[in-house]
């Protein structure tokens, strides 16, 4: 997958996936607006988003993503991942500034109505860092947090798709304006 060569011998490697009843272009708007100070993580808001609810609508100002953009990972914006590559409606790759971690998000059409949403995190722990004790916590919480995040994206994308089919209107433009 994109980014695998950037972290060739990761200490932590986790690939998660969910099938979404929607096309990649219907999922993409939810995916690229993800993050702190953006639409949230669609996960446990009390933990991931400091109690602020994740968005239930497409937010127009977060619909453009370019290589070099920083995806904040902390509320103060001091920690973040840089967008390393992006293929709209297909995939995006983030990486940390130290070159020790990548986070990949991909959309793979399964058939005319279904898409596999896949995310992969690869990182090399820095055991000499003052944050070294945080590393085991990442492994312990990652599966629950990512499951909730993926299911949150799935729920939103499928609801938008159902609404679009029911009303015949483009939900993205309806919700954003």
What are these regions (language model features)?
Residues 171-177:
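Acidic, Ser/Thr-rich low-complexity intrinsically disordered segments
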Residues 1-8, 19-21, 25, 32-104, ...:
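Glycine-rich portal/gate segments that line the openings of hydrophobic small-molecule binding cavities
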Residues 9-14:
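Short glycine-enriched loop/turn motifs at secondary-structure junctions
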């Amino acid at each position: 997958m994109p980014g695998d060569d950037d972290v060739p011998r990761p200490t932590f490697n986790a690939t998660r996936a969910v099938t979404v009843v929607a096309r990649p272009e219907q999922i993409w708007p939810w995916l690229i607006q993800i993050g702190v100070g953006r639409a949230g993580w669609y996960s446990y808001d009390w933990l991931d988003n400091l109690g602020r609810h994740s968005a239930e609508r497409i937010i127009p100002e977060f619909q453009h993503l370019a290589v070099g953009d920083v995806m904040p990972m902390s509320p103060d914006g001091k920690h973040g991942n840089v967008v390393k590559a992006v293929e709209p409606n297909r995939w995006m790759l983030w990486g940390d500034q130290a070159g020790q971690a990548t986070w990949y998000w991909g959309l793979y059409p399964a058939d005319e109505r279904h898409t596999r949403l896949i995310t992969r995190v690869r990182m090399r722990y820095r055991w000499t860092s003052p944050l070294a004790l945080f590393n085991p916590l990442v492994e312990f919480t990652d599966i629950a947090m990512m499951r909730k995040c993926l299911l949150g994206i799935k729920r939103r994308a499928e609801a938008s798709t159902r609404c679009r089919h029911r009303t015949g209107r483009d939900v993205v433009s309806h919700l954003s304006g």
